[in-house]
Amino acid sequence: MRVLTVLPQHNLQDVPAEAAAIEAAGYDGAVTMENKYEPFLPLAVAATATDRIELSTGIAIAFARSPMVVAETAHDLQTASKGRFTLGLGSQVKGHNERRFSVPWSPPVPRLREYIEGMRAIWRCWEKGEKLNYVGEHYQFTLMTPNFIPDRNGLPPVPVTIAAVGPAMLRLAGRVC
C-alpha cells in the first residue's frame, strides 16, 4: 500500500522544507489540490527538494486549461521530478466551469476522454517524433512546429488519474487511467 499526504501550498517558500519533511517521514508521495491555490507550481518547487516521493495533482481542474498547456506543464514536471509526477485531473461541476472559469459546458465524460487522448498524442509527438494529428469533437491538435517541441526527457509517459464520481466517469477511469 502506498501512502500519500497533502503538500501545503499556501506559501511557496515553505514548500521545499515541507516536501523534504514528507519524504523524510517515509511517505510515498505528496499531493496538491486545486482549491485556494494553483496545484502545479508547488510541485515544481517540491521536485527540486526531493528525490524519492511521487508528486501528484489530486486534482487539477481540466477544462479551465487547454490540454496543450497541461501537457506542457506535466511534461516539465515529469522532467523536473525525474519521472515522479502523476497528473490527476477532474472535470469540476457545470456552475464552476461556466461561471468561475468562463468555459462552455459539455458532457464531461467524452470531453475528459478527448482531453486525455489529446495530451497523450501531444506527448507521443514530443517524445517519439510522431506527427501530431488528434481530431476529436471537443479538441483538435494538428500543429506542432520544432520551436514548440520540448527536449525529449527519456522518461516514462506521465501517468494520468481522474476524479471519478458516478458510473460513467468510473468506466472512463478504467479505460484511460
Q: Which sequence ranges carry the predicted segments?
A:
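N-terminal beta1-alpha1-beta2 module of alpha/beta enzyme domains
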Residues: 1-57, 63, 158
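Generic domain-boundary/flexible-linker signal
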Residues: 14, 41, 66, 96-98, ...
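Generic recognition of short, well-ordered alpha-helical segments
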Residues: 17, 41, 68-72, 175
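Residue-level signal for the nucleotide or nucleotide-sugar donor/cofactor binding architecture
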Residues: 10, 64-68, 107
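Residues in well-ordered alpha-helical elements
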Residues: 13-16, 68, 110-113
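Acidic, glycine-rich active-site loops and adjacent beta-strand->loop/helix elements
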Residues: 36-37, 59-68, 91-95
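Internal, glycine-rich beta/alpha segment that forms the wall or movable "lid"
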Residues: 71-176
